[in-house]
Amino acid sequence: MLKGENAAQEQLLAEVDRFARVNSMRAKMDLKFEDNSFAEFGVAEKYKTADGEVVVQRPGKILLKVQIPIIKTDVAQMTSDGEKFRVAILEDGGTGKYKKFVLGTNSADYTALQKEVDKIENGEAQALKQNVNAFANMRPQHFTEAMLLRPVDTAANVYVQSEIFQEEFDINAKQKSPLRWVLRGYYLLDEISKQADGTMKISRRFWFDRVGGIRLARQQIFDASGDVESDIVYGREGDLTENGDYKKLPLRIEVTRPKEKYKMSLTYQDPTGVSIGKTYPQAAFLLENLWNLPEVNLDEKLREMKTKQTQAEVEKSPTPNNK
């Protein structure tokens, strides 16, 4: 068992708020994408890694550009203004028929729509999954809370501290060492919020690595049902910006979205080149369809699907016999 440091809850809360000091950021990043929705098909090779440029700003605003490395061709661009999102799929690795401009609402649940896509059984299923799903399922807002942590709110929430030990692989141990598997201790800090009906719900869980100090290593965000919405892992720490004013912040962030079945890691290409604290105009977070791509409004698609389902149920329901 690795030796762990002790910390009171106040120190853990302060560490979350230290991360939350970042109000805006602009950075160039290396992106690595893993699409698990159709594991048997995999992902088009050139989309596994990409260059990215990201701009984030509170509250919940983000611009993300994804480019093919070396040739710097835009694969996708996406924005969210905190309420709505827009995704332009600019490259599909094929004929271009999967290029789209997708619009939707941050708070909406499009799981039902995704299930309809998953029912595809014709020859286009593989091409669709390889070339479109990787970016069509990405939502820019998935990355805002990973990069811009919300500060704690002790007036509105209850925070509960506990500890946990996990068996982990020690990459620093010698290859034949019997100590390659170690027990690492973590503090868990659960954020519990009171609902309108009086029930309590977990909204976030923070994991703090206790080995060699206290380090925020992971953030889990839960939905209204208590299921994991985002699982965010923070890598090794370093200093950001040219002057190094923002110290001991993660240089790599990994975001896993279980419902959308994908994982994205973001690594700063040049930590000293990161810009923090500037204010960006609202227009920067409102992507326009300058490419005249076919538009797909997910809210409209969802309404259409629900209407069809309702009509189908009515048609299937038995009618009383005429007397």
At which residue positions do the language-model features occur?
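Gly/Pro-enriched, hydrophobic low-complexity segments
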Residues: 1, 136, 152-153, 157-300, ...
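N-terminal leader/targeting segments and the immediate start of mature chains
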Residues: 1-48, 127-137, 305-323
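Edge/loop elements at the starts and ends of beta-strands within beta-rich repeat scaffolds
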Residues: 16-25, 45-47, 54-60, 71, ...
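Post-signal peptide N-terminal segment of secreted/secretory-pathway proteins
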Residues: 31-85, 91-93, 287-289, 296, ...
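Short, mixed charged/polar active-site loops
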Residues: 43-49, 73-77, 95-102, 200-203, ...
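An acidic-aromatic
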Residues: 57-142
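Intrinsically disordered, low-complexity segments enriched in small/polar residues
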Residues: 115-127, 167-180, 195-197, 300, ...
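Solvent-exposed helix/loop surface patches that form functional interfaces
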Residues: 138-154
